[in-house]
Amino acid sequence: HFPAKEALFEAVVTARITDLVSEARSRADAADPGEAFFGFLSRIAGEAAAKRDLPDAISVSGSLREDLFAALDLLLRRAQQAGAVRAGIVTSDLIVLLKGMFAGLAGSTDPAVHERVFAVLADGLRARA
């Protein structure tokens, strides 16, 4: 039981971020760093389409935010080192892009729209040949 609605929301957000951090860390040792990175972003995009509070969740502060950013940073750097993600992108850029995607899709319930927008985001992150 939670004393207030805010406490329940905080507990849900904490659990969601903790799960995302765990998944990102588990993907960090994948044989294909590009697939690990884009697969994780796809998971985030899919979850955002299903659970509208994810933008608030990735805006969390404190140690959860640090853990999430560190896990994203590790996946991002490994993908960049493997040549899968363009150089020059930093984790804070990635967060801005994700938040922008979430905001732009906030009113859409069409999964095809979410898939297309994520595909464009992912293509923009891919290293140029």
Model-derived regions: residue spans:
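HTH DNA-binding helix-turn interface
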Residues: H1-F9
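Amphipathic alpha-helical interaction segments
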Residues: A7, E35-R43, D93-L97, R116-V120
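Hydrophobic alpha-helical connector segments
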Residues: T18-A50, S61, D67-A71
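A short secondary-structure junction motif
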Residues: D19, E47-K51, P55, A79, ...
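Short linear capping/connector segments at secondary-structure termini
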Residues: L54-G62
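C-terminal peripheral helix-coil segments that are non-catalytic and often amphipathic
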Residues: E66-V85, L97-G100, G104-A129
